[in-house]
Design a protein with these regions (language model features):
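Hydrophobic-ligand binding "helix-grip"
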Residues: 54-55, 62-126
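Intrinsically disordered, low-complexity boundary segments flanking structured domains
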Residues: 9-14, 50-52, 97-98
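Short beta-edge strand/loop motif at the mouth of beta-sheet-based domains
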Residues: 17-18, 24-25, 31, 35, ...
Length: 193
């Protein structure tokens, strides 16, 4: 688990509530696209590697993501695209899952989180909102791979990944990559992954 094969990208784009800063996580899985789609949209499977998810998992439906808030499914085009608006009306954040076939039966997953928020408070400290995404999504993309390979421990609670030492390398790598991209953006240079 110490090797992080996740690629990171940063960009800006418009969402419902204004200009958003976007963190993009790209990873290739050795699994068919339909299996990756099911793992990312089936509430039973999501609860194993991501978080408990409940609600109406159709376009226009409302979902809850455990302690991660609730949202509305804006677009759903199985097995390629899922867009969820989060944080009110208009949405302050948007997450988008994009899948495409990769070489030799693999699947390329792109997970994008767009936010109009500048910061998040964690443990009484203020952090850049994009920087914080690395700590959450980095280890979850690792656990998705373990889940797809049938190697995820049965007693793993995905809501506590940040507390488990075996996921520290994925958290650190993701947060470091996103911090570099955010700093590049603040300096006015064109960011690259």
């Amino acid at each position: 688990m110490s090797t992080d094969r996740t690629q990171h990208e940063f960009r800006r784009r418009q969402i419902e509530s204004g200009e958003a800063r976007c963190a993009i996580f790209r990873r290739t899985y050795d699994a068919p696209m339909e299996d990756v789609w099911d793992a990312c949209t089936n509430p039973v499977r999501l609860s194993r590697w991501y978080a408990p998810v409940a609600g109406d998992l159709r376009e226009g439906g409302t979902i809850t993501q455990g302690d991660f808030g609730s949202g509305t499914i804006r677009r759903c085009a199985a097995p390629h695209l899922l867009t969820v608006a989060l944080g009110g009306d208009p949405a302050l954040d948007e997450i988008e899952l994009r899948l495409q076939p990769g070489p030799d039966g693999t699947t390329v997953l792109e997970f994008e989180h767009a936010t109009t928020l500048d910061s998040h408070e964690i443990g009484g400290q203020i952090f850049d909102a994009v920087y914080c995404m690395g700590g959450g999504y980095g280890p979850r993309l690792v656990t998705l791979g373990l889940h797809l390979r049938g190697e995820l421990p049965a007693d793993l609670d995905p809501t506590t990944l940040h507390l488990l030492p075996e996921f520290a390398p994925a958290i650190t790598a993701s947060m470091r990559a996103l911090d570099e991209l955010v700093q590049t953006d603040k300096a006015g240079a064109a960011p690259c992954a």
